[in-house]
Structures are given as C-alpha cells and as structure tokens.
Amino acid sequence: YALLDRVWNPADRIVLELPVAPRLVRAHKAARELDGMAAIAAGPLVYCIEQADNADYARLRLDTAGSMELGYRSDLMDGTPVITGTAIDGKDAKSTFTAIPYYAFGNRGNGGYRVWLPTR
C-alpha cells in the first residue's frame, strides 16, 4: 500500500507507472527439473505459449539473446496483452513465438501449452 497524506484539490491527479517490460523468470535452484528453463512474465502476469499460436510449441527454445516485445491482441478474449519474441525451433532455426497470459490459455480449442520453456 502507498499512503498519500496531503490536502487534496479537485484537480489533483495521481499517476502510477509500473514497469511491465517482458522478462525471463528462472525457477529456484531447488526445482532441478526446471534447470535450463525460463518462464516469461510482464508486470505481475505469467505468460505461456499455446499451440494455437505456436504450431511447434513443444520444441521451441527461448533465444535468451533475442528481444521480446509487449503487444495487444484485440481478437483474443475481447483484448489481451501478448508477448512476441525470438525462439529456436525444433530444426535449430530462428523462429518467433507468441505468448499469452496464463489466465487466457485454453480459450481457442484443444491444444497444448507451456509455461516453462528451455533456453538456448
């Protein structure tokens, strides 16, 4: 919580800006099965890659040297933030991925998804 103790005027405004740039999150070292993997997050949201957007989702590896960009898809659940970035596909070729918030997976038919992804 943030306490703002002052005398307020009708025209006063509060602007709160929080960083929501996409980032990679690593698991605790005690989670050995997740060694060499990372999850994608932005702000408080954890993202996943879903088969609906990434046909080769099960074999994608994150390119940790690549960039990620936060975007928006108005056609997904009446508007959803998405992250796009660079990956390596199952044939060791550069590829791109689209990640959606974990809360949004499974809304476009049956298909797999992943939260934890191998890194390059």
Predicted regions and their residues:
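Short strand-edge motifs at loop-to-beta-strand transitions and within beta-strands
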Residues: 2-4
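C-terminal beta-rich recognition modules with glycine/proline-rich loops and embedded aromatic residues
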Residues: 6, 13-120
